[in-house]
C-alpha cells in the first residue's frame, strides 16, 4: 500500500486528486487547518494548525503532494500579499522540517507552482529550459515556493515541480470567473486581447500529476499546460461559442488595472507556456485544444 501525504487536499485540485488516488491501493493523509472526520478508511485528516500534528502523520510516507496556498482570486492588499507568500513558504518549510527530523524521507515530493515563473511576453514561447530570477510579486512567490521545495533533494527525495497554467474546472477557479460576464452578455476582449492564456483541463492536470509521481525519471520543473495555448481574445470567443453567448465587449487594460489592482497581472501580463518536458516523457493530453476542453466542461 502506498502512503500519501497531501496539503491542499480539500481544494479544487486536491479533492479531485484524492478521488483519483483512492481508487488505487493507497492510504491518504490530508493536512487541514480545521478538524475533519473521514468516513473512508483510505483517508485520514490531520489538523496541522494544532501543536503536535507531526506525531499524527504516519512514519512511512511514500509520496508528498504539496498544493497548499491561499487563492490568488482576491484583491492583493499589502496584508493579503503577505498571506499569499507565507501560506506557500511556511507550509513547504513545515513539511521539510517534518521529514528532516525523521529517519525516512518520502520517495517523491510533488510541489505545485505556476506559469507566473516566466516573464510576460506576447511573442516568446517558454519551455522548462528557460531560467529566470523574480521580476514581480507573483514571480517572487513562485520562485521562493520552488526554492523551498527543492530542499527535499537534500533528504534524497525526488522533487517534481508542476507549474500550473489556468486550470479549467467546473468545481471553481478561473473558468467560473471567466464565464460570469458571458452569462450577463457582457463578455469580450480584455486589454489588447493578445495576451496568452496557457490553460489545462482539470482531468489532464490530475493525470499529469499522477504520471509524474509514478515516473521515476521525472524530476525538476514541468509546465502543466495544454499543448495549444490561446490568446485571450480567441479564448473568450471560444468560450462564448461553447456557452452560446456573444463575445462583443472590450475592457481596456487601464480599467482592468483600476478594478483589480495588482491582481490584474494574472489576466493581462501572461505567457505562452508549452509542456515540452512532460510530453517528452510520453504523457498524452486528452484535451489538447481549447474547443474540446470547453465543450466537455460546459456540457456538464
Swiss-Prot record:
Q: Entry's SUPFAM superfamilies? A: NAD(P)-binding Rossmann-fold domains
Report the coiled-coil segments: none
User: Gene3D superfamilies from the entry?
Assistant: NAD(P)-binding Rossmann-like Domain
Against InterPro entries, the record matches this protein to: DUF1731, Epimerase_deHydtase, NAD(P)-bd_dom_sf, SDR39U1
One matching Pfam family: Epimerase
Where is the secretion signal located?
none
NCBIfam families reported in the protein's UniProt record: yfcH
Question: Member of which family?
Answer: Belongs to the NAD(P)-dependent epimerase/dehydratase family. SDR39U1 subfamily.
* Name used for this protein in its record: Epimerase family protein SAR0825
Amino acid at each position: 500500500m502506498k502512503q500519501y501525504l497531501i496539503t491542499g487536499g480539500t481544494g479544487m485540485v486536491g479533492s479531485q486528486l484524492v478521488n483519483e488516488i483512492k481508487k488505487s491501493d493507497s492510504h491518504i493523509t490530508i493536512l487541514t487547518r480545521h478538524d475533519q472526520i473521514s468516513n473512508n478508511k483510505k483517508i485520514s485528516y490531520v489538523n496541522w494548525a494544532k501543536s503536535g500534528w507531526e506525531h499524527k502523520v504516519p512514519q512511512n510516507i511514500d509520496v508528498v503532494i504539496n498544493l497548499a496556498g491561499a487563492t490568488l482570486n482576491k484583491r492583493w492588499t499589502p496584508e493579503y500579499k503577505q498571506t499569499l507568500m507565507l501560506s506557500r513558504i511556511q507550509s513547504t518549510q513545515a513539511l521539510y522540517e517534518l521529514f528532516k527530523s525523521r529517519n525516512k524521507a518520502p520517495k517523491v515530493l510533488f510541489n505545485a507552482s505556476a506559469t507566473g515563473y516566466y516573464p510576460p511576453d506576447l511573442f516568446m514561447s517558454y519551455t522548462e529550459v528557460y531560467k529566470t530570477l523574480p521580476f514581480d510579486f507573483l514571480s517572487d512567490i513562485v520562485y521562493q515556493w520552488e526554492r523551498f521545495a527543492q530542499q527535499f533533494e537534500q533528504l534524497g527525495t525526488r522533487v517534481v515541480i508542476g507549474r500550473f497554467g489556468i486550470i479549467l474546472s467546473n468545481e471553481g477557479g478561473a473558468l467560473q470567473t471567466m464565464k460570469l460576464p458571458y452569462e450577463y452578455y457582457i463578455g469580450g476582449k480584455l486589454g489588447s486581447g493578445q495576451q496568452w492564456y496557457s490553460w489545462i483541463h482539470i482531468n489532464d492536470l490530475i493525470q499529469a500529476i499522477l504520471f509524474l509521481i509514478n515516473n521515476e525519471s521525472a524530476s525538476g520543473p514541468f509546465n502543466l499546460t495544454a499543448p495549444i495555448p490561446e490568446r485571450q481574445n480567441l479564448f473568450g470567443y471560444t468560450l462564448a461559442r461553447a456557452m452560446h453567448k456573444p463575445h462583443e465587449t472590450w475592457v481596456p487594460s487601464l480599467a482592468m488595472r483600476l478594478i483589480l489592482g495588482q491582481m490584474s497581472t494574472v489576466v493581462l501580463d501572461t505567457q505562452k507556456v508549452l509542456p515540452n518536458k512532460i510530453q517528452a516523457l510520453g504523457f498524452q493530453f486528452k484535451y489538447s485544444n481549447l474547443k474540446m476542453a470547453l465543450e466537455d466542461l460546459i456540457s456538464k
